């Protein structure tokens, strides 16, 4: 039955060739490949986010003949800058699709979901991927609801075009999932499981085609359902928590907002990002966007330092891909020591000041 459906799908569509110039607005056409992947790209201030490139790496595992298209949406010059960067962000990207409209100025889920469905209808994609970030988790389920398919979330390994591995039970077990749906296979990718190999800067040798999507027939009746109110950000020179090479995390043992500033000072000296456990966030020491763990940010830095962190399974699930884990805790039986590469049983109120004294200022 599956083979019959596949053969019908392959013979139903015809190859479409186009000699349209690369710079003009064109309609999207299907190349009718067996595996054709659409990736929802995240960008900010004219720059493609690292988790999008990791998603491209994951898409490469779907099959050797897979074609990969990036979908960018937004408005203004920063969108076009991001599109130009996306065209050379990875050799596997064959096309960059750009939706330039005020409707996509903010990453609201409703218009984005309509856009993905609009692009899918014209492109006939077999797979639709997004990073397991707040962006991807917000948009992809809405697209899946529109298409009446079940998305597969938090994929950490791709075994084939229809078989994937994802964590369950707070990361204590791995589940192999096979997709058998009729619609496109939708995945959110845990970016820390698909590291990006540095690419030598041979910029002009491999660059994807950038196409402006023709939105003249795009109808969006969802604009009135939600509206952009505002965005709050923290002014800091520290790197983003999700992509930082060094992460310094504090737990509830720090006892107060004032004491948590020691973690911030240590992070500044090491050029790292600040993280926190759920207990520290719930206690009000830091905002919840700094939470590390299964229900917060999944991190995979070169160095992860945990102070006063006991090691709940939800927290450990969010740091397990870290290269080196250093733990400081008064409790010698704390679960964090079971996963730490280096552990120190001691009082953080003695250890951190000594570290701050001996570490040089970051240049």
Swiss-Prot record:
Domain of life: Eukaryota
Location of the transit peptide in the chain: 1-24
Induction or repression: Expressed constitutively. Not induced by dark treatment or sucrose starvation.
This protein's GO CC annotations: mitochondrial matrix; mitochondrion; nucleus
Sections of the chain in a coiled coil: none
Cofactor note text: Binds 1 FAD per dimer.
GO molecular function: copper ion binding; electron transfer activity; flavin adenine dinucleotide binding
Alphabetic keyword roster: Electron transport, FAD, Flavoprotein, Mitochondrion, Transit peptide, Transport
Cofactor entry: FAD
Amino-acid positions noted as binding FAD in the UniProt annotation, renumbered to this chain: 303-331
InterPro entries referenced in this protein's UniProt entry, alphabetically: DHS-like_NAD/FAD-binding_dom, ETF_a/b_N, ETF_a/FixB, ETF_alpha_N, ETF_asu_C, ETF_asu_C_CS, Rossmann-like_a/b/a_fold
Main location: mitochondrion
Family recorded in the similarity comment: Belongs to the ETF alpha-subunit/FixB family.
Function in brief: The electron transfer flavoprotein serves as a specific electron acceptor for several dehydrogenases, including five acyl-CoA dehydrogenases, glutaryl-CoA and sarcosine dehydrogenase. It transfers the electrons to the main mitochondrial respiratory chain via ETF-ubiquinone oxidoreductase (ETF dehydrogenase). Involved in leucine catabolism and in phytol degradation.
Protein name per UniProt: Electron transfer flavoprotein subunit alpha, mitochondrial
Organism: Arabidopsis thaliana
Gene (UniProt): ETFA
